Curated annotation (Swiss-Prot):
Role, per record: Could be involved in insertion of integral membrane proteins into the membrane.
Keywords of the record: Cell inner membrane, Cell membrane, Membrane
Localization, UniProt: Cell inner membrane
Species name: Proteus mirabilis (strain HI4320)
Top-level taxon: Bacteria
Lineage: Bacteria, Pseudomonadati, Pseudomonadota, Gammaproteobacteria, Enterobacterales
NCBIfam families: membrane protein insertion efficiency factor YidD
Keyword Cell inner membrane attributed: yes
Membrane listed as a keyword: yes
Gene Ontology CC: plasma membrane
Name the UniProt record assigns to this protein: Putative membrane protein insertion efficiency factor
Family, similarity comment: Belongs to the UPF0161 family.
InterPro entries: Membr_insert_effic_factor_YidD
One Pfam family per UniProt: YidD
Residues covered by region (Disordered): 66-86
Length: 86
C-alpha cells in the first residue's frame, strides 16, 4: 500500500465513494466481479497510487461486459523489492 496517498488518488477515491453512495444504490447489484469494480478501484489506488491504480481500474471496467464471465478478480499484489534476486 502506498505510504501516503497523493491528492489525485484521494480525489479519485472520493469520486468512487460518491458513486458508491449516490449512484450504485439506484442501479442495484450489477457487478459481475468480486470485489466490485468500485471496491477494486479504491484498493488499486491505495495500493499502487494514482497512475497505476487508475490504469488497473480502467482495465477492470473495460472487462465488465456481458461477454466476460466475471468472477473473482482481486487487485494484484505489489512486487516486494525485498524479495528480488540479485
Amino acid at each position: 500500500m502506498a505510504s501516503s496517498l497523493s491528492l489525485g488518488s484521494k480525489i479519485l477515491i472520493l469520486l468512487i465513494r460518491g458513486y458508491q453512495l449516490g449512484i450504485s444504490p439506484l442501479l442495484g447489484p450489477r457487478c459481475r466481479f468480486n470485489p466490485t469494480c468500485s471496491h477494486y478501484g479504491i484498493e488499486a489506488l491505495r495500493r499502487f497510487g494514482m497512475i497505476k491504480g487508475s490504469w488497473l481500474t480502467v482495465k477492470r471496467i473495460l472487462k465488465c461486459h456481458p461477454l466476460h464471465e466475471g468472477g473473482d478478480d482481486p487487485v494484484p499484489p505489489r512486487k516486494n523489492d525485498d524479495n528480488r534476486e540479485n
